[in-house]
């Protein structure tokens, strides 16, 4: 019994026709190849990776060799995984596996035989589409940076740092000169203040010494006057206190 090559309006019609052919041959094909992606993620609890390739092998083993056709395949899951970067997160790998499986099922049930060159072209296009999807997913969350722009920014930043360092080195002597002039002015002011305070203290000391000398001189004059007065008084008292012999002598000789 030959397989019909009539075109199908949908995948469901093609699948029903395939089931009828297999039942006519006495085989019981599996109709549930894969659940929907959302149901799979919900049931499996967001598993990181899964391997659906044994199902493909079981399905290929159930089909007789007479009905096998050279169907175009975009790329296998192992090839797609080899082309995927290792730094992709787990959910991106799951997404790529699901895209690969859908592409495989569509190509597997198409009834049109394709030449080798066309299958190779579709393989290249499929791999390019997968890579473009990965690139879009990555670019949606991360902004791409042009390496030339980054090198230019680094060069400008380094140049700016060098210019700032030169400006600091040029400004340092200015600050040092300004600081030295300020220190000189401060030292000069301090020396003037010291001289002024020294002169004031000297004048105060001179004044106190003069006052002290004047006071001492005055005290000496007063004491000398007192001593002279005391001597005069003593002489006078001595003159008044004559003895009887002196008085008789005076009377006899002088006639007093």
Swiss-Prot record:
Residues 64-79, 141-153 have a biased composition (Polar residues). The keyword Coiled coil applies. Residues 61-83, 141-256 are annotated as: Disordered. Signal peptide: none annotated. Residues 208-247 form a coiled coil. Residues 161-188, 218-227 have a biased composition (Basic and acidic residues). Keywords: Coiled coil. This is Lysine-rich coiled-coil protein 1. It comes from Rattus norvegicus (Rat).
